[in-house]
């Protein structure tokens, strides 16, 4: 166990994402990125109570509460640099980030969805939230149609032997317990993607981690063989993660025993 009571091979760092990725001792085979800060014009609006940052350095007309010291493209570039050859990027997005992220990946990583050769942008999947009656959730606020979930972008570094028939589109119940954190995403979709693209004992990285559902998914799937590094600049994120882990992992272990 680490000093944070995490299993050997698992860590949660309070650091800048780019710097922490640069200092990894091992190449991750998958990076699960949730860059919730990439919504510059929503800073301090629509429930976004934290500072945000631009997608790239060319973005102009920015409001207050926007951190221009880092951009989404810097994080994406670093992900590509540190990923193992054939490794996957699984990136949560939203309506604003999705087209920009896809275009950037196509231009910088490649467009394997078009060429069927090499690597780069592969596919858009997503998570659809279910309501209590099992139908798609319609409670997401919004005047111009509700979202009821979020898109997820899949890309890989160069050609890859990491293949899976797991669906890129998953359904899940909305997480009700927030653990003092603003946005908590379900674990079950990431269990499927971890199971499909990662093997026990292989490292995954989770920058901009929050409560890090992908890390908890790896721990559920692989137990003591899980290997992950979570990264966030907010110490409250780590506190929320530890609370969630204590609840989710213990509950999961009890379910498997029962």
Language-model-detected regions and their locations in the chain:
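Core catalytic lobe of class I
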Residues: 2-231
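Conserved SAM/SAH-binding beta-strand->alpha-helix loop
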Residues: 234
